[in-house]
From Swiss-Prot:
Residues 1-9 form a transit peptide. Its EC number is 1.3.1.104. GO terms for biological process: aerobic respiration; fatty acid biosynthetic process; fatty acid metabolic process. This is Enoyl-[acyl-carrier-protein] reductase, mitochondrial. The gene is ETR1. The lineage of its organism: Eukaryota, Fungi, Dikarya, Ascomycota, Saccharomycotina. Belongs to the zinc-containing alcohol dehydrogenase family. Quinone oxidoreductase subfamily. Induction: Positively regulated by the zinc-responsive transcriptional regulator ZAP1. GO terms for molecular function: DNA binding; enoyl-[acyl-carrier-protein] reductase (NADPH) activity. It is an enzyme of class 1 (oxidoreductase). GO terms for cellular component: mitochondrial matrix; mitochondrion. Present with 1560 molecules/cell in log phase SD medium. The modification Phosphoserine is found at S339. Homodimer or in a complex with other proteins. Interacts with ARS1.
């Protein structure tokens, strides 16, 4: 397990600047969303002596962040004139981890202490910034026990994976009960397999066919706790389903939950493997193909298919996110969930030496880059 954060012990450990620096946008562009981003230096309008001031430690660049810049994401922040702009603007980013560097004297600070590591309770707070300001501790969740990479990604991938496993099925951990999921190499799927294993639930993860299939499958099973990994060609093969699948699942197996983030043919194939009156949750659509399910699954097998959106779920019930983070941290501390560090490429923002132009190019690289998930880590 990676070492957790160390806490500053005095308020003199950090000097709050008069000017903040944020990556902002006023317009949207679908074809090249990097064009709408700019770096803005501004004086915060809040009274910092009466506010909770946070310095940013790291923020990931998520697909939802990019979709907001494109203007196609259903949830987006309100644009304001708070950043000394000619047009209303918003700070980009929905997720990140921060350190408390200044607290007000009143009750609004709650149980926060200088040096606490926190994440925002809700999305649309604007995380691509060197500092952020909050008015109440009730808008923040402490994550002191998590390493940097887990803390910076727990709001989206962590919550999604944990809630998909925990919030919809009343599991019998002593039974032979299964989850089937596609996109088995995704960050969310890796959380799912780890959480499920800790709860005594078995997982069948489907991944794309590839030359190094056995190598990837072994990592997913040995490192991330998947019970069994199969390929999409096996997932779509009716003979495999009839002759091989039952041997994998074992006696009295119950495939009770399907998790779909691909759509298209893959979603129908995982749905076919569910028991009667089971549930399929769709939380993504990587193939950009619609979810098409056979009529027979609904009529004769009583399939329920519904969507899951972590932003809306936690907006409607903020306590569910607080509880999820608490349970996630417990599993992390027990060693049931490992850090996603190996899956992340870090981009360094040195707050003393990185110029505005370099910062903008850094984030643009994170948006357009391929391969591993990109995370901007601030050096102070």
């Amino acid at each position: 397990m990676l070492p957790t954060f160390k806490r500053y012990m005095s308020s003199s450990a950090h000097q709050i600047p008069k000017h903040f620096k944020s990556l902002i946008y006023s317009t949207h562009e679908v074809e090249d969303c990097t064009k709408v981003l700019s770096v803005k230096n501004y004086t915060p309008k809040q009274d910092l002596s009466q506010s909770i001031v946070l310095k940013t430690l790291a923020f990931p660049i998520n697909p939802s962040d990019i979709n907001q810049l494109q203007g196609v994401y259903p949830s987006r922040p309100e644009k304001t004139y708070d950043y000394s702009t000619d047009e209303p603007a918003a700070i980009a980013g929905n997720e990140g981890v921060f350190e408390v560097v200044s607290l007000p004297s009143g009750s609004s600070k709650g149980d926060l202490k200088l040096g606490d590591r926190v994440i925002p309770l809700q999305a649309n707070q604007g995380t691509w910034s060197n500092y952020r300001v909050f008015s109440s501790s009730s808008d923040l969740i402490k994550v002191n026990d998590l390493d940097l990479f887990s803390a910076a990604t727990v709001s989206v991938n962590g919550c999604t994976g944990f809630q998909l496993v925990s919030d919809y099925i009343d599991w019998n951990s002593n039974g032979n009960e299964w989850i089937i999921q596609n996109a088995g190499t995704s960050s969310v799927s890796k959380i799912v397999t780890q959480v499920a294993k800790a709860k005594g639930i078995k997982t069948l993860s489907v991944i794309r066919d590839r030359d190094n299939f056995d190598e990837v499958a072994k990592v997913l099973e040995d490192k991330y706790g998947a019970t069994k990994v199969i390929s999409e060609s096996q997932n779509n093969d009716k003979t495999f389903a009839k002759e091989v699948l039952s041997k994998i699942l074992g006696e009295n197996a119950r495939v009770r939950l399907a998790l779909n983030s691909v759509g298209g043919k893959s979603s129908a194939s995982i749905a076919r493997k569910l028991e009667n009156n089971a549930l399929m949750l769709t939380y993504g659509g990587m193939s950009k193909q619609p979810v098409t399910l056979p009529t027979s699954l609904h009529i004769f097998k009583g399939l329920t298919s519904k969507g899951y959106w972590v932003t809306e779920k936690n907006k409607k019930n903020p306590q569910s996110k607080i509880d999820t983070i608490s349970d996630f941290i417990k599993m992390y501390n027990y060693g049931h969930i490992i850090s996603p560090r190996d899956e992340i490429e870090t981009l360094t923002w040195n707050t003393n030496t990185t110029t505005d132009e370099q910062l903008l190019e850094l984030v643009k690289k994170g948006i357009t880059g391929k391969g591993k998930k990109k995370m901007v880590v601030l050096e102070w």
